[in-house]
């Protein structure tokens, strides 16, 4: 079911602020695995942030021409004007930049050492495996170093590889390849390119052949699919919204026309093809409700047909097999995801029949359809499982995955008739391992492509903390098996708790570095996230947001009670919308932590939700509520909003990384938060006047490059090094 299904299951709405605060669209990134991934000590949920590609083994050369009249748009995007008074913004920005220049020197030497260690770990645990490939018939397409190559055999070497596309030669020097789609007859290739400093992508359509030619350039494209040999459907993104679907043809009489428009500002439109390429699906999703339209790929010019009209609170997603629609949906009780089916000719929900229902408190992480099977990736009590449904024998086989695994990455399977499903398992401190499930053999096989060094000095513990209302909240803890006196070791606590998204539990070299140096890592799976299913999210959004805060407090207190560190050695890490709970705890219980590190944090909920002119505010109402229409909601948001609850008290030290180009969380709000927090901390210190009174460090590191989800490898590595240097100074020098 590829990337769209994963996004769908992990929160569904592509317009929500994990797609507004956090752009967590799970795309098939067709770039070399040699490419360093973005470092994050701050695990915002599920994020696959893109970064630039380092030099590869195959070098590009000039090879194609642009069709006459085809213009390549400039990607040097101008930043939108600031809505707050320009002078105030400039003064605040200049003040924080000056402050950073004055204090950054104290972290420079340590950050340099940390950066070197992370690079060494990256070399040790990252292997030169081949790029993900698209197989179409006898042809193999793959991407490396910003270029797309074609090979007619599986044996890829410079002798039998032909270059089709180079981002650099097209003038996209700072862009990376985001997605590739090949037309069924392989005459055309559509590729999207995205800059690190911009949310918008550009789609370049090339006519293949002996001498590839740029046929069309489409700016501001979000998703696109070939419906037939010469008909491309795509969605247009404007101001972070995606509500229009267009069809463009590459026949003799070329034309482009609008096919679908979404009128409701709460909904975001995305398209993809079913696995068997029988239908193109037009998916209009809010954060709680779905509506899907089908375009028959055999008749691409016919109007889309509605599957089921949107019903409040019902989320659904469509796949196809043998003239039946397979529907992944929250319809029915309990309101968790379940697999249902219906005939194509009568697709209304009155005809939906149950195929498979999840057990209680089980999270559906992903689903992949094949011709005769369906694989469900499940999570229960912190453990990962495979459930394999056979459409032939009507049986279900359940396989428990290795206990160390905390996350998985499903590899793309362009051929739905394949007999093997490939995926990778990982954890924050375990490098990815490749596995294969064989439908023929009914077994799981570990693919030892290259020996991965075994991590033997890390112990994993799964705990349950009792929250204020008696709800049990999962915690995943990692620590060095050789560590003694854990109550004296530094503890880094991670939290998110929004949009039904899980904490990111994939491998990060910097996490392993901390474990090797004796740190404890804790991941608090609080309500508002999705770790325990759809209801876990509902129980932590809108008027239930404070439950997530109660959960976080209970988790940290349990960790300390069990001897995992103590407050003066404890730090809290969060990013984007995770900043709400982290910032709220910093106000309500600052005594529980010594330091806090935030990345692109959402910390002014009330002011943001009061400004409907912002592009994403209306979409956010299903997560946070509508304070303009509901005074009770306004008071509730104000009760936990990090910015509005700052007061003179003894705060922990705080390090915030923010981006000038962040279109999702404007820098002005972060600047105001830092100024207010620093003033409150200084006011408290001035009032108490105790001997040796501790004054926290409140630091804002503003990045001119990068955006909310995208930074180069070098920039992100430097960011992480500075964050770790700050944490070490705060926790190890106590």
Regions found by a protein language model. Name each.
Residues 131, 136-146, 325-326, 336, ...:
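Structured, non-catalytic alpha/beta "coupling" segments that mediate domain-domain communication
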Residues 155-157, 196-197, 211, 298-301, ...:
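Secondary-structure transition/capping motifs at alpha-helix termini
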Residues 526-734:
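Active-site-proximal cap/loop segments of hydrolase catalytic domains
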Residues 330, 426, 494-499, 576, ...:
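Glycine-rich His-Gly loop
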Residues 332, 369-372, 376-380, 465-471, ...:
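C-terminal substrate/ligand-recognition segments
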Residues 169-178, 440-441, 448-571, 575-576, ...:
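Cap/lid segment of the alpha/beta-hydrolase catalytic domain
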Residues 1-47:
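N-terminal chloroplast transit peptides
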Residues 2-14, 58-391, 395, 504, ...:
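Beta-propeller folds
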